[in-house]
């Protein structure tokens, strides 16, 4: 296990998406283990580019007028997951605690259940 974390986000025109990406990276103890999978539904007047600070990312960009809803976007972003050790579904407007990645992995191991779900 290499502790790769797939962060799944479905975002519909959320102006805080880039903030969340920056925050999740800045507060991670091991940002090099982060992989982003995002369905970014952007408005015509919005910048569709995102900055991942050189980290691995898989992004599906959809003009907002072509969106078919939240579940549809989640389904698209789920398909971006490959062989990462952890899959975490997050919102596009979140703040993270310092070393959040290390803390959640520790919590997972404390369960002693390889199929544990943390919420």
Where are these regions (language model features)?
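Catalytic cores of eukaryotic secretory-pathway lumenal/extracellular enzymes that build
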Residues: 2-119
């Amino acid at each position: 296990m290499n502790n790769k974390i797939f962060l799944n986000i479905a975002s519909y025109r959320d102006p805080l998406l880039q903030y969340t990406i920056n925050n999740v990276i800045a507060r991670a103890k091991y940002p090099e283990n982060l992989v982003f999978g995002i369905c970014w539904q952007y408005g015509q007047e919005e910048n569709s580019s995102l900055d991942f600070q050189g980290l691995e990312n898989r992004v599906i960009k959809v003009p907002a007028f072509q969106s078919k809803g939240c579940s549809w976007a989640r389904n698209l972003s789920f398909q971006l997951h490959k062989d990462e050790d952890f899959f975490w579904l997050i919102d596009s407007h979140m703040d993270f605690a310092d070393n959040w990645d290390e803390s959640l992995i520790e919590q997972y191991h404390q369960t002693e259940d390889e199929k544990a779900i943390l919420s």
